[in-house]
Amino acid sequence: MSLTIPANLVLNPRSNKSLTQSVPKSSARFVCSDDKSSSSTPQSMKAFSAAVALSSILLSAPMPAVADISGLTPCKDSKQFAKREKQQIKKLESSLKLYAPESAPALALNAQIEKTKRRFDNYGKYGLLCGSDGLPHLIVNGDQRHWGEFITPGILFLYIAGWIGWVGRSYLIAISGEKKPAMKEIIIDVPLASRIIFRGFIWPVAAYREFLNGDLIAKDV
């Protein structure tokens, strides 16, 4: 019994040679691509660090006052605003001439003049925007550059209004157990009211505590 090997199954030496030569080329190519990916990692980290540093600088930099709303200009650049300042100061100085230099009215007018100058200076310093009439305008569109014009005073107003209401409520509750509570509403009990006034400064905490306890709202009126 004999075996016959077909001629097409015999490997060509040239093909073996080319096969052995192609292996290192492909492996060399693989090594180069691996080096490139590993070297790109530090570069990406450097780019990310630079982006973070740049964003922190931009966020920490103060924003200048610009005319970002149609028809309004920064008060420090408004001619009508400067004209109003001169007119008010001139009016006060003309009234000052009617009194002796060291008299009480003269001292009051001098203080008023300094107060007027300081007020106009603060309007220009804090970036308020003025209209064509030279008057500052409050911006209430939520822009962070104008929070100090509306949101901060608004929160302060709500706190003061809540403090007044809380103190009055606490006083009425305190005198409700008296024999003649109506008389204490007409003639205020000053010592009791003084104690309640100072306790009223923490009214947000006290209101939250009563809300949790169920005492904030009367159950039966």
UniProtKB/Swiss-Prot annotation:
Its main location: plastid. It comes from the Eukaryota. Residues 1-32, 33-67 form a transit peptide. Keywords: Chloroplast, Membrane, Photosynthesis, Photosystem I, Plastid, Thylakoid, Transit peptide, Transmembrane, Transmembrane helix. SUPFAM superfamilies: Subunit III of photosystem I reaction centre, PsaF. GO terms for cellular component: chloroplast; chloroplast envelope; chloroplast thylakoid; chloroplast thylakoid membrane; nucleus; photosystem I reaction center; plastoglobule; thylakoid. GO terms for molecular function: mRNA binding; protein domain specific binding. GO terms for biological process: photosynthesis. The chain crosses the membrane at residues 147-167. It is a single-pass membrane protein. Pfam families: PSI_PsaF (PF02507). It is found in: Plastid, Chloroplast thylakoid membrane. Plants lacking PSAF have altered thylakoid structure and are not viable. Participates in efficiency of electron transfer from plastocyanin to P700 (or cytochrome c553 in algae and cyanobacteria). This plastocyanin-docking protein contributes to the specific association of plastocyanin to PSI. Belongs to the PsaF family. This is Photosystem I reaction center subunit III, chloroplastic. It comes from Arabidopsis thaliana. The gene is PSAF.
